[in-house]
Amino acid sequence: MDKVKYPVLTEKTIRLLERNQYCFDVDLKASKTEIKQWIQDFFKVKVVAMNSHRPPKKKKRIGPVLGYPVRYKRMIITLESNYSIPLFLNK
């Protein structure tokens, strides 16, 4: 599915992994129900809660041209305690 762009791995999101919360950047037009259904079907997990926010715009200069990068929505997904996403497991 092209609505889920990629997982986000920052210091904060790595701390969230301990609470069984995972962070993804998704398409701005994607709804919570679409993303929830896709996560449950693709990873075979049970989603308990979802939080979303849109990070603020930031200006980007390329030479003399000033513009804005493509907008996205960030989803923080909480799973049931007995589920995990194998993509984020450490070995």
UniProtKB/Swiss-Prot annotation:
A molecular function (GO) term: structural constituent of ribosome
Record's keyword terms, sorted: Chloroplast, Plastid, Ribonucleoprotein, Ribosomal protein, RNA-binding, rRNA-binding
Location of the protein in the cell: Plastid, Chloroplast
PROSITE patterns: RIBOSOMAL_L23
InterPro entries to which the protein is assigned, alphabetical: Nucleotide-bd_a/b_plait_sf, Ribosomal_uL23-like, Ribosomal_uL23/eL15/eS24_sf, Ribosomal_uL23_CS
A cellular-component GO term for this protein: chloroplast
Family, per entry: Belongs to the universal ribosomal protein uL23 family.
Subunit structure: Part of the 50S ribosomal subunit.
Reported function: Binds to 23S rRNA.
Protein name per the record: Large ribosomal subunit protein uL23c
